[in-house]
Regions:
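Terminal alpha-helical segments
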Residues: 1-119
Length: 119
């Protein structure tokens, strides 16, 4: 049976913390931590802005830019931080020559946790 409760994006942050804290992690582990950390914050931000009636998301790739631009218009620092997380996520997901260390993964998760509390 499928649950009728919506997914809580904080679960992505919990997963990111688990992945980043694994000292035996490999590139797939640490890259996934960056990706999940970004998506946790992005989804919380999108839902918050939608619930407040600030945006009408299309539930497509264009929502990433929409959320970042909207956050920047409301609080430049928060929007810039989310954009930085997105760029890290893009690098981790698409640039195969990039190396992501455990330290970078842990720092990214910490940044995502701090940013989530500002939303």
């Amino acid at each position: 049976m499928i649950s009728q409760n919506p997914f809580d994006p904080k679960g992505f942050l919990t997963l990111a913390e688990t992945l980043a804290s694994n000292p035996a992690g490999d590139q797939a582990t640490y890259r996934s931590a960056l990706s999940r950390a970004y998506y946790a914050v992005f989804l919380v931000a999108r839902e918050s802005l939608t619930t407040k009636g600030v945006i009408s998301p299309s539930f497509s790739a264009s929502d990433h830019g929409l959320v970042i631009r909207t956050l920047r218009s409301l609080n430049r620092q928060v929007g810039d931080q989310l954009d930085k997380l997105r760029r890290k996520r893009n690098r981790a997901d698409y640039v195969l020559t990039t190396q992501v260390s455990q330290a970078e993964a842990m720092q990214t998760v910490a940044t995502a946790n701090a940013l989530r509390t500002k939303l």
